Amino acid sequence: MAAALRASTLFLVGFLIGVVVTRLPLSTALPILVGAIPNAWNVLDSSWRYTARTDGEVLNITYGLADRRRQSIRLDRIHAVQITQPFLWRPLGWYEVRVSVAGYGASASGKASGSTRILPVGTLAQARQFLPADAAPTYASPARAKWVSPLDYRQQTVALTGDYVIVRNGRLNRRIKAIHTSHIQELTYRRGPISQALGLATVDLDLVQGPVRMAARNLTLADATALLARLRSRQLPGLKPPR
């Protein structure tokens, strides 16, 4: 059911109805169907009978409809976590969890070397098990940020709790992202022409390659500078011997 409520699947269903109602020529409809059907199938196949269990320092994942697949991820290689609630999932209280894993960069074919979805669909309580303890926002976008982010500016917040950074954004599709400060690769302070005129700045948190992208967007100059200073003083991990 969760797969059916994804935008790509709804598009496919709506398109098929449109083909019947409008009698769209097959020569026009076929290329669109060829592109849409594989995506809908991938969503269903990668979510079917999905289980994720921890065994010591390893997260074991099993999933698949046509072909059962198994995958093991060392917990210390999970660098960032993202909880997403698509707009259509809100009435059902469903959430999805994805992670960025060190060493899961894209291959030559453009595909990641392993699954980064560790909870295809679950409750908020289940999703929060992958996050540090929640905290009140430390920084938030001011009201004038509505000129550059009219939909999301009220939801754009950053919380610093212990050694973690938690970023929230998204009004339609809600997202919560978290990372241990030691896993931040680089920090980038940026201001575009409009942001300069509004007295705003964004701090990008550069992470390992993966689905999680983090940025403290459209903060006041004082807040962006303070956040940058605090994160620059983070404790960096020492070199570890290879396992």
Regions found by a protein language model. Name each.
Residues M1-R243:
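N-terminal basic, Ser/Thr-rich segments that initiate or prime the first beta/alpha elements at protein or domain
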